[in-house]
Amino acid sequence: ATFMDFRTPQDGAVRFFYVLPFADNQALVEYTLFTDARLTRQETEQALATYLQTVHGVAEFRILEEEGGCLPITDAPFARRLGKRVLAIGVRGGRIKPSTGYAFSRVQADSDAIVRSLLACGHPFEPLAEPACYRWLDAVLLRVMRTHSAAVAPAFAAMFDRNPMSRILRFLDEQATALDILSIMASLPAPLFVGTALQTAAAQIGAGGKARQRGKQRGSRQPAATGMSQ
């Protein structure tokens, strides 16, 4: 299997492939990109053909099945409680990890939290708390992808080269230890990520101050976030 293969033209966006073989001559090939503009079907098929030929030496192939979609990649807050008896879940409930688009493990953890809330409180409105550390890291990576997309591929290459896969998977699943997080952060290009981290912190502090001021004027506190959507 191939995980996040960046050997494809980035063209001003973050683009990579996944390859999951089922047999010697059959595989699932997924093309992922973080962008504001959706590709046409022709552009997607051309990128797939170019990748298979230049990276894997496959000039002729047949597509057996295909699917596509677009996910919201943003760190903006999602309203979860939509009424007295309605709780947003899944994509609508902001269960997609902002910086990667991964959702399966987050949905499972959220489902467990909903069950615990029902058993303990008689309602589902005590969901799993969002780890502030991961949300800040998501915001940093989103800012890097938006402002320095060409630097993402070498940064991820360094991260994969300097960390065991088990640590990376724990990090992506938001199950990492403090040492895991520090090790991964240390493996990334310091000038870019430290600078972006400081910019992100300043932006969040500034947005929070404006939100508190609006809250005083309107009698409520408004959440604020910056991000990029796909």
What are the functions of these language-model segments?
Residues 7-13, 35-113:
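FAD/FMN-dependent oxidoreductases across multiple families
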Residues 112-230:
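C-terminal helical "tail/cap" subdomain of flavin- and related membrane-associated enzymes
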Residues 27-29, 36-37:
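Conserved anion/nucleotide-ligand pocket segment
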Residues 3, 15-18, 44, 48, ...:
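Internal, well-ordered alpha-helical segments in soluble enzyme and binding-protein domains
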Residues 27, 88-92, 131-136:
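Short acidic (Asp/Glu) and glycine-rich catalytic loops that position anionic groups and cofactors
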Residues 1-28:
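Rossmann-like dinucleotide/flavin-binding elements
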